[in-house]
A protein has these predicted regions:
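Flexible "arm" and connector segments at domain edges
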Residues: 1-67, 71-107
Length: 107
C-alpha cells in the first residue's frame, strides 16, 4: 500500500488531469461533483449503518471507495483554484484547535 503526502496527492492528480485538453472542470462543476460524491458516501453509510440495506441488484461499493472519490474531487477543486491543501488544512486545524479547545471533555 502506498502512502502519500497532500503535496504528492495534488501532484499525482495534476499529472493525471494535465493529460487532457479539457483540464480541470470549472469550480461550479467541481462543486456539483463534490455534492454528488457526498451523496454517494451518504448512501453507503446508510447501507452499512442505517436501516436501508442494499438491493441485491445494487453494485457493491465501500465507504473507503467513496471517501477516495471525494478526495479525488476535493483535490481537483483545490488544484483548479491553486490552493495548497496542506496550508488549507493547517489553517483549519489552527482555527478548530483554538475555537474548540475547551468544548469537549478531554481524556
Amino acid at each position: 500500500m502506498n502512502y502519500y503526502t497532500t503535496k504528492e496527492i495534488q501532484e499525482r492528480v495534476d499529472s493525471y488531469i494535465s493529460q487532457f485538453k479539457e483540464g480541470y472542470f470549472s469550480p461550479l462543476s467541481l462543486m456539483a461533483r463534490m455534492t454528488e460524491e457526498v451523496g454517494e458516501l451518504a448512501r453507503e453509510v446508510n447501507h452499512y449503518y442505517g436501516e436501508k440495506p442494499k438491493k441485491a441488484s445494487e453494485q457493491e461499493k465501500t465507504i473507503e471507495e467513496e471517501l477516495g472519490d471525494m478526495l479525488f474531487v476535493l483535490t481537483c477543486f483545490a488544484n483548479s483554484l491553486e490552493i495548497d491543501l496542506s496550508q488549507a488544512f493547517e489553517q483549519s486545524m489552527t482555527k478548530i484547535e483554538t475555537r474548540d479547545k475547551d468544548r469537549w471533555t478531554r481524556k
